[in-house]
């Protein structure tokens, strides 16, 4: 399969009514928006405004941000405002943290209902907002806990090896773990750091039970589609930088995919920000991961 490499988002803007946009690696780098991102988002938001939809198509673009941030949606919105990303430029934000919070609040399925109330949080203090309003008691040791919420390493410089003793101890107690960020790693300000998904994968390898919320799992995309209010999946595209979360998840949900190549796979592809990808090298990388997007673009630019 040949992957089309597009000059920018304008090339597909008219083909779709709904856009599911990844944040980290597409819109921003964890600290600042990418050079072209705000301009592109502004143009995309305005691309359908005031037009006659015709044939059942939407008169304005539906834009939903889908992030594996282990924080609630309102916190991610506030962070984007701080970065200078106007709240008026998109419709909704769905985060893995919000999905986690909703699942723990509702406890409407047997797995979550059985978790208990004593929780060991693996993750930095900045993620504590995830527990507000949940009637949980946070504890500090596996032997005190009934389950684990994993939002990632306590410090960016830490590696999996730093957590192996803790995770091994938790596994002996068969503590269920919720992974509130399935990403394995992320690049923050040019530095590659591990995410909660790396810790969860190791914990699962010990035979311990793990439940994931976020991409690439189906509930994340169903939440986006519900927020959009669009029924025709052929008119929806997901734009992301990770083959194993963004592209895989969207493909499984039956929506089109566009890979941004200057994100998490940039080193693998030998690219700096905005570099045009080599088609053969891109297809080789996709083959290694056994995931093929319909198209690719160097950066989220118009």
What do these predicted ranges mean?
Residues 47-59:
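Intrinsically disordered, low-complexity terminal tails and inter-domain linkers enriched
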Residues 2-49, 64-302:
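Asp-based, Mg2+/Mn2+-dependent phosphohydrolase catalytic module
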């Amino acid at each position: 399969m040949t992957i089309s490499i597009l000059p920018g988002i304008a090339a597909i803007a008219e083909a779709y009514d709904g856009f599911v946009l990844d944040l980290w690696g597409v819109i921003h780098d964890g600290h600042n928006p990418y050079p072209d991102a705000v301009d592109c988002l502004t143009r995309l938001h305005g691309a359908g405004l005031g037009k006659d939809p015709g044939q059942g198509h939407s008169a304005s673009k539906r834009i939903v941000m889908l992030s594996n941030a282990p924080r609630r949606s309102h916190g991610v919105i506030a962070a984007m405002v701080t970065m200078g990303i106007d709240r008026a430029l998109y419709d909704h934000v769905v985060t893995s943290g919000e999905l986690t919070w909703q699942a723990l609040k509702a406890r409407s399925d047997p797995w979550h209902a059985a978790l208990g109330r004593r929780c060991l949080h693996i993750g930095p203090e900045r993620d504590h907002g995830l527990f507000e309003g949940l009637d949980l008691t946070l504890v500090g040791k596996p032997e005190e806990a009934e389950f684990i919420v994993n939002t990632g390493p306590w410090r960016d410089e830490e590696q999996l090896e730093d957590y192996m003793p803790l995770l091994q101890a938790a596994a002996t107690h068969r503590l269920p773990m919720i992974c509130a960020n399935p990403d394995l790693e992320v690049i923050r300000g040019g530095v590659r750091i591990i995410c909660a998904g790396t810790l969860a994968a190791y914990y699962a390898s010990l035979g311990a039970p793990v439940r994931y919320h976020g991409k690439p799992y189906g509930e994340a995309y169903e939440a986006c589609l519900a927020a959009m209010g669009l029924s025709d999946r052929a008119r929806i595209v997901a734009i992301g930088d990770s083959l194993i979360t963004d592209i895989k998840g969207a493909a499984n949900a039956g929506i089109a995919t566009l890979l941004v190549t200057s994100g998490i796979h940039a080193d693998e592809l030998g690219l700096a920000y905005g570099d045009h990808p080599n088609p053969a090298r891109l297809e080789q990388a996709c083959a290694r991961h056994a995931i093929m997007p319909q198209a690719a673009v160097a950066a989220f630019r118009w």
